[in-house]
């Protein structure tokens, strides 16, 4: 049950990026936005595949997830791609400075999970900055609505870093 709640929270918190083209056009209707719609569908597909691979855990999928996230990053306006790229780096015990940079870029776009994880990652090295990110989280619309709390967001982010297998 806990695993399903985590997965549902992951998909719900995945981010709602706004797009400048009409993405509601059906495939059989001619539209001037068809290239934009195709690009948006590919972006959504890349993000979904990458999130599923990351949430499944294991290092087998990391390389493909990384490639999908890099391709999706060019269209991402929500900070979601940077957040998941940082998760992969943290999970691999890779370059922490690069992971922090990716999280900061995602935080600038108000990605809630990135802000929570950034506050946690900076807690030991820069407590003042970590506290500022925690305060920034409290100012997000999603936090003001009561769901998810900072602790719940950390639980989801930590679950991505060390997935339950």
What are these model-predicted stretches?
Residues 24-49:
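Post-signal peptide N-terminal segment of mature Sec-exported envelope proteins
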Residues 17-19:
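Bacterial signal peptide processing site
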Residues 39-46, 53-57, 61, 74-82, ...:
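Short helix-capping/linker turns of helical repeat alpha-solenoids
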Residues 13-15:
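C-terminal motif of bacterial Sec signal peptides marking the signal peptidase cleavage site
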Residues 127-165:
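Terminal, low-structured helical/coil segments at or just beyond the last alpha-helical repeat
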Residues 71-72, 104-106, 136-137:
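Canonical positions in the second alpha-helix
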Residues 28, 59-67, 92-102, 126-132:
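Structural signature of tandem alpha-helical TPR/SEL1-like repeats
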């Amino acid at each position: 049950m806990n695993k399903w709640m985590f997965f549902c929270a992951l998909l719900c918190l995945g981010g709602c990026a706004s797009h400048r083209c009409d993405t509601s056009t059906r495939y059989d209707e001619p539209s001037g936005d068809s290239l934009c719609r195709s690009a948006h569908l590919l972006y959504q597909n890349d993000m979904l595949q990458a999130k599923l691979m990351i949430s499944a855990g294991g290092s087998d999928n990391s390389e493909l997830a990384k490639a999908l996230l890099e391709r999706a990053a060019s269209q991402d306006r929500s900070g979601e791609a940077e957040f998941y790229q940082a998760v992969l780096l943290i999970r691999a015990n890779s370059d922490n400075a690069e992971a922090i940079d990716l999280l900061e870029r995602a935080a600038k776009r108000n990605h809630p999970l990135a802000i929570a994880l950034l506050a946690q990652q900076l807690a030991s090295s820069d407590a003042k900055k970590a506290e500022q990110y925690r305060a920034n989280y409290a100012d997000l619309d999603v936090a003001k609505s009561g769901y998810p709390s900072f602790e719940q967001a950390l639980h989801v982010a930590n679950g991505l870093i060390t997935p339950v297998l």
